[in-house]
Amino acid sequence: MNPNQRIITIGSVSLTISTICFFMQIAILITTVTLHFKQYEFNSPPNNQVMLCEPTIIERNITEIVYLTNTTIEKEICPKPAEYRNWSKPQCGITGFAPFSKDNSIRLSAGGDIWVTREPYVSCDLDKCYQFALGQGTTLNNVHSNNTVRDRTPYRTLLMNELGVPFHLGTKQVCIAWSSSSCHDGKAWLHVCITGDDKNATASFIYNGRLVDSVVSWSNDILRTQESECVCINGTCTVVMTDGNATGKADTKILFIEEGKIVHTSKLSGSAQHVEECSCYPRYPGVRCVCRDNWKGSNRPIIDINIKDHSIVSRYVCSGLVGDTPRKSDSSSSSHCLNPNNEKGDHGVKGWAFDDGNDVWMGRTINETSRLGYETFKVVEGWSNPKSKLQINRQVIVDRGDRSGYSGIFSVEGKSCINRCFYVELIRGRKEETEVLWTSNSIVVFCGTSGTYGTGSWPDGADLNLMHI
């Protein structure tokens, strides 16, 4: 074989080997890709199949993405199921109250579209707190705001915003209502909404955005409820409702509600003579309410609600310093643990108090006859002793000369204890301020603290000369 033939032969063999290697590499690549997708088919559901997490109530979807070489694997982590609240933690020990929130609704109304409201309150779900109020179907800068001093019209609706967000035009109208209560059971919101004719009103029970139950007026005389948060323990929510004479004998019932359905109704029992507008708080394993006696007493009624057997016990806050308005001066007032004190009991205002061992924390107007100013304090042995008048840790929330209004309690669960908070309604306009034709409010909110705190006053602050008439 001559040199040229040898070179051609070697070249041909090399080309053949290279070609074989090339096809082998292609075969290896095809095999690798095929095996990869075969494995994906075995480990993944068909495209039209949905993988469901159990249980079906999901609060948050969390997608964890893990990068492995050049492969992306998405793994859905099923969240913990939502659970009913049980409020079994102890009450937080506090030294007083610290500022928490103020919405400045009336001041903002001078330059924007803010709802006309009254009867505000605050309630919290597991993550956030919300402010509620009964709207009048109009903004303040609107001629429809004239004569909104009226309590009950078909245009009133329950408004709901995150706490600190004034009720602007984008605010959600939860339901039709001129009296209401709301609470979160750990899974969803319950709203109790009353509207209709004075002598034949309807209470609608809305749970998780759906109407579940309803009840009609049972005494045909302005069915009404708390105007503050209800309380849910282990899936059972309680709400206090009254129908009947506003300054005489009325018919009060406590409704037990599960996921919006009325499961039991108990009549008021015990020594409370007249009960309206209760401010309720969890006192595990039951619920405790401090209410308004609009008939006989300037001392406030107490209702203890047993969730398990539906029994009801009622009496009055013992403290010799009483919490309603109007009332006698502190030097001349008296109280009774079982009965109304029969001191300026006719009329009143929604308020709150809560027990702290044998002591009692309470809030009230500073003025003894009208809704002016607001103060809080602790009465030593005020939960157990009707002669107790030792006041400590007093704070001024609103100065004596500035208007206040309704007030109520709400509870916030922390990591180790349950804190008590309160709000104060700051009413402006008619009847007292006749330079305008409307009636509305803003709110200020404080929460219990174990720390230190200073002094101040937090009135509504709007200059009515700058407002729409």
Predicted regions and their residues:
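Extracellular cysteine-rich, disulfide-stabilized repeat modules
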Residues: E76, C289-C291
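Single-pass membrane-anchoring alpha-helices
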Residues: N4-Q39
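Short beta-strand-plus-loop segments that form exposed binding edges in beta-rich domains
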Residues: G196, M241-A246
